[in-house]
C-alpha cells in the first residue's frame, strides 16, 4: 500500500477571541498520495488556509493528528513547502537573492546554492531575470519567483494557497499550464487552494470541497480528465458537468 505524503486524521480546530468562539474545522480526514495534485475549494471562512497552517506547524489542531510520509513528527515545520497567498518577496533583494533564502536558512555555501538555483531558472521562465528586483516584475513573474523559492526548499510536497488569485484571467491561464508542466516534469505532490472552481477542476487529480464554517469534508471528487490538460477542455461537456456539480455543492445556482 502506498504511504500518503500527507494524511489528516479527524482534524478539528477552534479559535477563541475575546468575545467570540470561531469553530474553523471539524473532523476533517483525507489523504494526499505521492505525485497527486489535489485542489481544495470552499467558501471564505471554511478553514482552507487553517488546514495549511496546521499542516506546516504554524498552528496545532485541537483534535486529531497529521501524518507526513506516514510519520507523526513532533515538529512539522519545514517538512513541506508552503507558499502563502502573498508572494512575500523582499524588495531590497534581487530575484536570485530572494530564491536563495531556503539555502541560506540551511547554511548551504552561496556558490553551491547559486548554481543549484540558476539551474532551475529556465524551468520557471525566469532566465535573464536573476538580477532584477521585485518592483520591476509583473504579478505573474513575481508568483514564479515565489514558487521557485518554495520549490528550492527541496520538499516533495508543496502547499500553494491561492497563488494565482490576484492575477488577470490570461496570466492565470498561462501560469496554470506552466505549473502543470513543472509539476509533471519534477513529480512533486501539490495541494492547491483556490476559489475558482474551473481552476480547481482544470488542475486537479482530485477536488476536495469544504463546507461552510466549521469546515467539514463535504465532497471528494476524482477528476478523470486526460493529461496533459489543455485550456480547450474548459468548453467540453464533461468539464462543464464537473464544474456545475461542484458549484451545486457550494450552493451556487448554474
Name these PLM-found stretches.
Residues 203-209:
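Conserved catalytic segment of ABC-fold P-loop ATPases
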Residues 14, 226-229, 252:
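Active-site/binding-pocket entry motifs
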Residues 3-198, 203:
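ABC family nucleotide-binding domain
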Residues 166-169, 243-254:
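Extended, non-globular alpha-helical segments
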Residues 212-245:
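Conserved beta-strand-loop-alpha-helix hinge in the C-terminal portion
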Amino acid at each position: 500500500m502506498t504511504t500518503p505524503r500527507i494524511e489528516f486524521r479527524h482534524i478539528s480546530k477552534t479559535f477563541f477571541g475575546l468575545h467570540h468562539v470561531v469553530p474553523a474545522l471539524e473532523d476533517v480526514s483525507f489523504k494526499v498520495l505521492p505525485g497527486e495534485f489535489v485542489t481544495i475549494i470552499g467558501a471564505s471562512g471554511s478553514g482552507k488556509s487553517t488546514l495549511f497552517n496546521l499542516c506546516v506547524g504554524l498552528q496545532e489542531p485541537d483534535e486529531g493528528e497529521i501524518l507526513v510520509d506516514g510519520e507523526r513528527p513532533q515538529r512539522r515545520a519545514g517538512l513541506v513547502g508552503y507558499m502563502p497567498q502573498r508572494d512575500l518577496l523582499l524588495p531590497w533583494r534581487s530575484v536570485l537573492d530572494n530564491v536563495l533564502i531556503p539555502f541560506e536558512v540551511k547554511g548551504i555555501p552561496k556558490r553551491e546554492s547559486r548554481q543549484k538555483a540558476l539551474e532551475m531558472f529556465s524551468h520557471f521562465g525566469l532566465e535573464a531575470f536573476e538580477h532584477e528586483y521585485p518592483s520591476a516584475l509583473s504579478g505573474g513573474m513575481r508568483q514564479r519567483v515565489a514558487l521557485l523559492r518554495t520549490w528550492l526548499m527541496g520538499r516533495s510536497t508543496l502547499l500553494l494557497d491561492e497563488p494565482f488569485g490576484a492575477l488577470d484571467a490570461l496570466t492565470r491561464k498561462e501560469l496554470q499550464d506552466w505549473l502543470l508542466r513543472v509539476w509533471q516534469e519534477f513529480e512533486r505532490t501539490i495541494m492547491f487552494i483556490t476559489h475558482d472552481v474551473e481552476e480547481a477542476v482544470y488542475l486537479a487529480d482530485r477536488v476536495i470541497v469544504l463546507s461552510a464554517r466549521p469546515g467539514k469534508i463535504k465532497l471528494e471528487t476524482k477528476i478523470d480528465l486526460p493529461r496533459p490538460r489543455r485550456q480547450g477542455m474548459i468548453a467540453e461537456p464533461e468539464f462543464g458537468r464537473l464544474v456545475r456539480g461542484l458549484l451545486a455543492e457550494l450552493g451556487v445556482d448554474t
